[in-house]
Amino acid sequence: MPIQAVEPRRLYRQIADQIRTLITEGEYTPGERLPPERDLAKQLGVSRPSLREALIALEMETLLDVRVGSGIYVTQPDESRRTAELAGASGPFEVIRARRLIEGECAALAAKSATGAQVRAIREAHTAVLEESKRDHNPLDADRLFHMRIAEAGGNSALVLVVQTLWDQRMGPLYRTLELKLEYPLMAADTNREHKAIVAAIARHDARGARRAMHHHVDMTMKRYSKDWKVEQ
């Protein structure tokens, strides 16, 4: 048999495999509740964000049911459920960490080089996010446009493609399933304030301030996605 390349496996998939094995071997049975997230992360020796990515993947496989305010329960799996779409998917927290690295620099570049028309386009995208938020909608498309406008204003087409790829992952199945566990209206006001600070820094051509504002926004996004999933009552 010819030698085949060894593919690195994402941590959340390794965690998911271990939990899946515990379920298939009968350690946890359908209807049973898993230990609280904090305890389970400690037992596995992993971070809670990585564990959460694994739990979301297993929920999409119908092996688990994450009930906000109640707990994480083993379910009777649906064998017909397709999981191929998860094979190459990045975990939501991987995407957030990558966004911090890339979009912080995009914001700094935008502050240095954005034209008046580009600043107006960023403001218009920010307004669209606000309008969608007022209707209690998760303004995902408007949010994507806001961040793409910033990347475009930086004038680096390679970075624009990277941000586009990150947002393709941002809108993928793992991320979208995670968002169902969150209460978007409670996050909207903070998100909009953070966006406003980014816009202001870019408009005054403050590269350092724009980078700092974007880093703060992405850091707070990580915090919200880590904190607001309450399943341990």
PLM ranges: what are they?
Residues 1-102, 108, 112, 231-233:
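Short linear motifs at protein or domain termini
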Residues 1-2, 207-233:
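C-terminal effector-binding regulatory domain of bacterial HTH transcription factors
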Residues 8, 184-187:
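Residue-level preference for long, well-ordered alpha-helices that form the structural scaffold
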Residues 22, 26, 81, 169-177, ...:
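A short secondary-structure junction motif
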Residues 27, 33, 83-87, 116-120, ...:
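Hydrophobic/basic alpha-helical segments enriched in Actinobacteria
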Residues 95, 201, 206:
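Acidic/histidine-rich alpha-helical segments that form the ligand environment
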Residues 97, 188-190:
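Short helix-capping and inter-helix turn/linker motifs at the boundaries of alpha-helical repeat units
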Residues 99-176, 194-200, 209-221:
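Conserved amphipathic alpha-helical segments that form helical-bundle/coiled-coil interaction surfaces
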